[in-house]
Amino acid sequence: MLPSQSPAIFTVSRLNQTVRLLLEREMGQVWISGEISNFSQPSSGHWYFTLKDDNAQVRCAMFRNSNRRVTFRPQHGQQVLVRANITLYEPRGDYQIIVESMQPAGEGLLQQKYEQLKAQLTAEGLFEQKHKQALPSPAHCVGVITSKTGAALHDILHVLRRRDPGLPVIIYPTSVQGDDAPGQIVRAIALANARQECDVLIVGRGGGSLEDLWSFNDERVARAIFASQIPIVSAVGHETDVTIADFVADLRAPTPSAAAEIVSRNQQELLRQLQSGQQRLEMAMDYFLASRQRRFTQLFHRLQQQHPQLRLARQQTALERLRQRMRIAVESQLKRAEQRQKRTVQRLNHYNPQPRIHRAQSRIQQLEYRLAEIMRGRLSERRERFGNAVTHLEAVSPLATLARGYSVTSVSDGTVLKQTKQVKTGDLLTTRLKDGWVESEVKQIAPVKKTRARKPSPTKPAE
């Protein structure tokens, strides 16, 4: 059984990952010198090779985005100096380095020293902007620390004579290349500070290789420039050449000629500046006077506008405008009221009952006339019918029959006597005549014999 406090158990993947992270975090970026072997460049453009010495070797990879900055083609057996990151290729567990830059061994060692000194001085704060001194403007005397036979001195003097012929120049000749050069440059800077003859120094030389410019990467020169009480302009090599002196100097010029232009005054430019300043001053004065004149005119107009008579006139004008507005408003109100009245009258006329009453009365009169006509027609018709009925009634009336000589006899109970069997001898009868009544007593009842009517004889048809 495993003990209760057993160590952690790693998988292979986790082990490789942990080792890779330790290498990358603890080692960081390093400089390595060695001999190239097994160099290859597949279609991807990356470089793969082995870096070795007499006792060991290590696999290297340099990716395309890094190797495109290398200015030479690496060869088998070539001694190089590389700047690389140490890592582990996890899938195979191979320890390798990822190369960021590569240089031939000679220049590479110098570059390594350059980077180390740069990092050291950066950590000490020698490059910080707060230590930079401002250049005098204008400079009253210029000191030049360079070779008295070099092209740099010729270029500096040529520019100074062209731009500012009256500017004093003090030359502190010194060697700028070789083992003695750093010490001579340091002594020249100290001499210039001790004599205090100039208020700005140009320290530099012409272009060259890294070895040629190495005097200006010397720590002694860098510290002498930093300690100088006189502002220093570095002018080493060409624009692409950057030395430690450039970082520690108060100002870096890309070339010696540019340094001379920086510390000198261009008399023609000064004249143009004076003329431009005079023109700006005249324009400013003209503008000031014109603005004062405009201001005076504005104040004068304001005073005139504040005069009581003008204020009264403005108030009268405003009053007249108000009066006109009031008149227009009243007229407008009256017109609108009149229009509303007309519309109201029109609506009242439209709904007035008098015309309707007249129409109704006319209708009633027409109906009364028609009714009277109808009534007259009906009365005439009824009179005619009544007359006909009267005539007919008179024709069938018993009275009319009586008037023709007939009479009506009724028995005692009022029943009209129609047959003899209705009475007997001794009954009283009442007879109605045309002009009165006659009462009689039955004395005798004698029935009448019935006679049969003859049938008409048939007639012969005519022959």
Curated annotation (Swiss-Prot):
It is found in: Cytoplasm. The keyword Phosphoprotein does not apply. Its EC number is 3.1.11.6. Keywords: Cytoplasm, Exonuclease, Hydrolase, Nuclease. It comes from the Bacteria. GO terms for molecular function: exodeoxyribonuclease VII activity; nucleic acid binding. It holds the Pfam family Exonuc_VII_L. It catalyses: Exonucleolytic cleavage in either 5'- to 3'- or 3'- to 5'-direction to yield nucleoside 5'-phosphates. One of its GO terms (biological process) is DNA catabolic process. One of its GO terms (cellular component) is exodeoxyribonuclease VII complex. It is an enzyme of class 3 (hydrolase). Its main location: cytoplasm. Belongs to the XseA family. Heterooligomer composed of large and small subunits. NCBIfam families: xseA (TIGR00237). Bidirectionally degrades single-stranded DNA into large acid-insoluble oligonucleotides, which are then degraded further into small acid-soluble oligonucleotides. This is Exodeoxyribonuclease 7 large subunit. It comes from Klebsiella pneumoniae subsp. pneumoniae (strain ATCC 700721 / MGH 78578).
